[in-house]
């Protein structure tokens, strides 16, 4: 059996949803899975995160350059957490044959603080399943790194069983600092996971990482399964990643429990004269659940509201919501920054989604700079409804109706000059 066929079979066994962006060397995997085409890699990963929140394992297949496009949700996943496993299957074009640059995707493991698995000919099936298990255990996206040498090689077919062990998103009772502290604790656990992982065979001599030859085998390439004593010499396909990271150790862990709103003593909430407060209160009262974005809408994840499930970075709410809550709340700037591609994809596929765009003509949550762009100018394809934030009756009607397909509502409001987020004692 060829490595490409083994990876396809293993993914079909371990995952429920597949998204793919063709490109050498993973086009055959995308086709073999009949993966859903997506407008870009960032949107594909956000769809997968939405699947995760809904209890579905999801795989996103892309070539090395595509990993650059989805860096934001990849990094954010560890802080926000997830439920069912999400794995980015990335093919590295090492020559390159069909790429404009040579890239080693393993470095994203360090940047995003996520596990990276690089199977060899004897560990294709087990390596795929382990990537999903690690994603669930450590509540973050996993990376499965593939190379042409593995995909073209004759490999061993094993019978690894699927064992779902869903994780949990970060507790909404945690502050942002508390979520980061939680992420750090889980990240430090990756080191013991790698060192104790049975997929590795560290017996001395020259170690081969992934499909590279060696007397020992390294599969969990980030974090590496040993230091210089265990891995004195390493053969690798690409840059000397494992050799460079043999000395990496877990970070110093704070003895304090992750910070909660209760331990901090207050919640942060919207400005006192926020024009959208009526909408937010209505969503809370009706127990609406939504994917929310970076910016003011992220405050909806607070226990004060209990509306937002998670936020995976700027522009993420639309694709995440399309595969989970079917409701997204996003700011006008976030939409134009990097959310509009997801909205295009949602309308192309007619995915049910109520997309609520907060038009306050502000660029940032902290700076409040005036925006130069009006989203209405660029949303002709969506035929959006424009509703004043003060028209709570109309907004109430829109929240009541089931969404048969995509509906975009621009809620128009003007932020108070000099307004600042308020705090509420716990």
What residue spans do the PLM features occupy?
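Thiamine diphosphate
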Residues: 17-20, 24-103, 107-110, 114-117, ...
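Extended, non-catalytic scaffold segments that flank or surround catalytic motifs
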Residues: 323-327, 340-342, 346-355, 364-407
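Hydrophobic alpha-helical segments
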Residues: 159-161, 307, 345-346, 373, ...
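A generic membrane alpha-helix/interface feature
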Residues: 73, 157, 163-165, 349-350, ...
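Flexible, low-complexity linker and terminal segments
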Residues: 1-17, 118-296, 380, 384-426
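Short, aromatic/basic amphipathic alpha-helical patches
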Residues: 30-33, 99-108, 158-159, 369-380, ...
């Amino acid at each position: 059996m060829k490595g490409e066929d083994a990876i396809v079979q293993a993914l079909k066994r371990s995952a429920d949803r597949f998204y793919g962006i063709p490109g050498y060397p993973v086009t055959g995997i995308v086709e073999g899975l009949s993966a859903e085409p997506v407008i870009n890699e960032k949107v594909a990963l956000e769809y997968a995160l939405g699947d995760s929140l809904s209890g579905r394992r999801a795989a996103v297949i892309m070539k090395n350059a595509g990993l650059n496009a989805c860096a934001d949700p990849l990094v954010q996943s560890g802080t926000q957490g997830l439920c069912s496993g999400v794995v980015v299957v990335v093919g590295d074009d090492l020559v390159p044959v069909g790429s404009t640059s040579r890239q080693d995707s393993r470095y994203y493991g360090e940047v995003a603080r996520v596990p990276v698995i690089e199977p060899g000919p004897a560990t294709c099936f087990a390596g795929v399943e382990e990537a999903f298990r690690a994603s669930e255990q450590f509540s973050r996206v996993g990376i499965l790194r593939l190379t042409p040498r593995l995909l073209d090689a004759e490999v061993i077919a094993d019978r690894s069983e699927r064992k779902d062990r869903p994780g949990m998103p970060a507790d909404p009772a945690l502050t942002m600092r508390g979520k980061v502290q939680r992420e750090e604790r889980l990240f430090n656990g990756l080191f013991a996971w790698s060192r104790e992982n049975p997929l590795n065979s560290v017996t001395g001599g020259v170690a081969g990482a992934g499909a590279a030859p060696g007397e020992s085998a390294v599969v969990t390439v980030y974090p590496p399964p040993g230091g210089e004593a265990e891995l004195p010499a390493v053969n690798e396909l690409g840059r000397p990643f494992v050799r460079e990271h043999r000395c990496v150790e877990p970070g110093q862990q704070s003895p304090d429990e992750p910070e909660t709103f209760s331990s901090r003593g207050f919640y942060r909430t919207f400005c006192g004269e926020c024009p959208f407060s009526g909408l937010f209160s209505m969503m809370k009262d009706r127990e609406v659940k939504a994917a929310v974005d970076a910016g003011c809408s992220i405050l909806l994840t607070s226990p004060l509201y209990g509306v937002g499930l998670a936020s995976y970075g700027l522009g993420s709410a639309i694709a995440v919501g399309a595969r989970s809550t079917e409701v997204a709340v996003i700011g006008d700037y976030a939409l134009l920054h990097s959310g509009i591609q997801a909205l295009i994809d949602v309308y192309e596929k007619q995915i049910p989604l109520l997309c609520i765009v907060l038009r306050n003509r502000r660029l940032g949550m902290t700076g409040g700079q005036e925006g130069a762009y009006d989203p209405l100018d660029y949303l002709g394809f969506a035929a959006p409804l424009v509703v004043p934030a003060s028209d709570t009756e109309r907004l109430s009607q829109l929240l009541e109706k089931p969404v048969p397909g995509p509906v975009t509502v621009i809620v128009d409001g003007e932020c108070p000059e000099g307004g600042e987020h308020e705090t509420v004692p716990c």
